[in-house]
Amino acid sequence: SSAEIARLLNIPVVLIVSARSTAYSVAPLIYGFKHFNPAVKIAGIVFNQVSSPSHFAYLREACVDAGVECLGYLPMTEGLKIPSRHLGLTLTAKRSMNTLIEQAAELVGKYVDLDKLLSICHRNFPCRYTLPYSSETGVESFTPSAKKMKIAIARDPAFNFIYRENIDRLSALGSITYFSPVYGSDLPDADLVYLPGGYPELFARQLHRRKKLMEALRTYAEEGGKILAECGGMMFLTRSLTARQGGTAYAMTGILPLDCTMVGARLHLGYRRIEYKGMELRGHEFHYSNVVAPDAMPSVAKQFTARGMEVSTPLYSCLLYTSPSPRDRTR
C-alpha cells in the first residue's frame, strides 16, 4: 500500500480527504489516520469536494482538534469530475486532459497553501532502508540487447493501458512502431508485438471486422513471432469475445484455443502467489472478463491470495491454436 511505502521510505503523507456529505465529523477519521500507525507520518490534509468556505471552516476546525495540519481544499467543481467505468477512469480523446489539469492547477493555487505543502515535502527524512539493485531483492539488472529489435505496439481506444516504464524498457531493446487494431492499421514488420490492456470489449464489433490484421497476427504467431499480450491484449488473442450487452460473440484472432466473455462478469482483484513447476511467482490480478477453455485443458498451476486462500482463476499453458480458416473461427 502507499502507507507501507511511506513507512519504508520514511516520507511524509499528505491525505486527500473527500469532504462530500461530512463536516466536523471527519475529525475522528483524521485522528485515526494520524495515530493508527505512528510510523506513517501524516503531515497534512487537503480536502476535496468542499461545498463552500463555511463548510471548509468546519473541516479546518476538525483538523485543529485532531492535531493535523490543514493545507487547504478544492471546491466542488463540475469541470473536475472524471466519469469512471469498470476498470478505472474514462479517459478519451474527446476531452482535453490538459484543460482539466490546468483548471485543477488554478484551483490548487487559489485554495491550497502551496508554500506550506512544499515546506513539508522538502524536509529531510532519512530513509532507514536501502534496496540494492539486484536480483536478490527481486529487481533484476537490465542490460539492453546488442541486437536492436523492431517492436510493434498496439495503441488506440481499445488498447491503451500502457506504463511509461514499459515503453522505456522496450525502447532500450530497439525501435518502436505503434499501430491501431481498432482503426485498421496493418501489422508492422516486427520482432516483437506488444498488445497492452484496455477495453477491447467496448470495441469488439470494430475489432471483429479487422480480418486482415487478425490474419496477419495469426500468421505472425504461427511462424514463431513473439507476442506479449496483457489482459485486454490477451482477450484479442482468443477465438471469440462475447460482449456484456446483447451477449453477441465476436470472432477474434483465434491464436489461443480459448473464448472470452463479459457475460456475468465480476471483479477478480488482489495480490496473487502462483506455484508452477517448483517456482513461486507473485503478481496482481485485476479483471472482469472470464476465459472459457475446452474441458480437456486443465489449469497448470495453483493460485493463492496474499492470505494463502486458493482462488479459482485458472492458468493455462496453451499450444498455438490452429484451424483451417478464419471462417471456421467465426461464431
Predicted regions and their residues:
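Inter-motif core of Ras-like GTPase G domains
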Residues: 2-18
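Residues that mark the start of a beta-strand
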Residues: 148-150, 252
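Conserved small/polar residues in nucleotide/adenosyl-binding loops
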Residues: 321-330
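Cysteine-nucleophile active-site neighborhood
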Residues: 200-275
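Internal gly/pro-rich beta-alpha loop/helix module
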Residues: 24-134
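C-terminal hydrophobic structural anchor segments
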Residues: 265-304
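A short helix->loop->beta-strand "cap" motif at the edges of active sites that frequently abuts
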Residues: 11, 68, 223-225
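Phosphate-binding active sites in nucleotide-utilizing proteins
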Residues: 150-154, 158-202
